Amino acid sequence: MSLQAPKGTKDLLPTESYKWQYLENKFRNIAADFGCREIRTPVFEYTELFQRGVGETTDVVQKEMYTFEDKAGRSITLKPEGTSPAVRAFVEGRLFNETQPTKMYYFTPVMRYENVQKGRLRQHHQFGIEIFGAKDASVDAEVISIPVGIYKELGVEGVELNINSIGCPKCRKTYNEALKKYLSKNYDKLCSTCKTRFDKNPLRILDCKVDTCKEIVKDAPIILDYICDECRDHFEALKSYLDVLDIKYKVDPFIVRGLDYYSKTVFEFIIDDITICAGGRYDYLIEEIGGPSMPAVGFGMGIERLLLTLQEKAIEIPEEAYVDLYLGNMGDKAKLEVLKLAKELRDRHIKCEIDHMGKSVKAQMKYANKIGAKYSMVLGEEELNTGKVALKRMEDGQQIEVDIKEIDTLIKVFK
């Protein structure tokens, strides 16, 4: 039996990679517009990072992480999300000593042991932005505006933005007490995981995916009724900034996100009942990981889910021709000249393909057409003797005569 990719993973083949490159280039340009610079972190980290950052009682840590011991007996985890590693790098690199805010973006694979379903893989990829050092709600609004701009530029319609505030540790303590009082009436109906969460972290019960628990929390107390004045002012300011930016939103008091590090602002972008981007503020994570007390906010966007959305909305990503010129040849002498000419053109960043298969001229032209070459030319004995060759535009068949030796003139055709 032939070997296959592990369940929940997917190869990115050359026929699809242009879509990723298109999105990545667009994301990079938009991130640069906001003053963000790229960060790259390891694909695995010490398990403690996610236990402390994401939270011991979360589904991510309890059920979804790929964790193993290395040969030295250290507990290692393939990263299940991008924020904690970015914060760890920020702290370890002592970037908090630099002028703030620090703005960074990343593309990263993330691994979670989840049920494989439409738009959900065990290895997927995220585009994320993290901004450290700014506590004003205006930066929350700016971060939210980035996915808004991405969807608008891609032509994706029907995306809903839901926002909430989950307060700070001070006001969340009061809310947790009210939540536990409410949940205690239905304690016996909670799933085994949520019974454990009841004392350790009742807020996580709001994020449970079990149907009985989802039904129980429908009438639970609303956290917005319990947040302190500072958190309320921050949330009201955020709404004002979103209004100024003409960003439509809906307040959803039951958004808590599945990661413990969030505080104050949380948000989700939803289309057809599927979350395609999410994030929020995490003002205590930097200190939790060993850095100074410093505010932060960010988001993660699933690239596979975005591509699926584009496909479902029949939004096509333009495929650029990856070959500028197909250089055909007739005979061994011509093949040598084609090799030399291709090298000269490639040195000038003209994308060339030549025949290595000994195909007939007819087969070479058929291949040139199949790979989407913009132009083609065929060198044979006559072309070598005269120094002239017909350059054919594949789109419409129009031909012009060019001098093989006049490289600069030839280059101008492609620029």
Swiss-Prot record:
Q: Where in the cell is it found?
A: Cytoplasm
Q: What is its EC number?
A: 6.1.1.21
GO molecular function annotations of the record: ATP binding; catalytic activity, acting on a protein; histidine-tRNA ligase activity; transferase activity
Question: What keywords are assigned to this protein?
Answer: Aminoacyl-tRNA synthetase, ATP-binding, Cytoplasm, Ligase, Nucleotide-binding, Protein biosynthesis
The reply to whether Aminoacyl-tRNA synthetase figures as a keyword in the UniProt entry is yes
Ranked from the top, the taxonomy reads: Bacteria, Bacillati, Bacillota, Clostridia, Eubacteriales
Which Gene3D superfamilies does the entry mention? Anticodon-binding domain (3.40.50.800), Bira Bifunctional Protein, Domain 2 (3.30.930.10)
Q: Report which superkingdom the organism of origin falls in.
A: Bacteria
Q: Which family does it belong to?
A: Belongs to the class-II aminoacyl-tRNA synthetase family.
Q: Which reaction does it catalyse?
A: tRNA(His) + L-histidine + ATP = L-histidyl-tRNA(His) + AMP + diphosphate + H(+)
Q: Which GO terms describe its biological process?
A: histidyl-tRNA aminoacylation
Specify the enzyme's EC class, one word: ligase
Subunit info here reads: Homodimer.
Q: Which GO terms describe its cellular component?
A: cytoplasm
Kindly provide the name given to this protein in its UniProt entry. Histidine--tRNA ligase
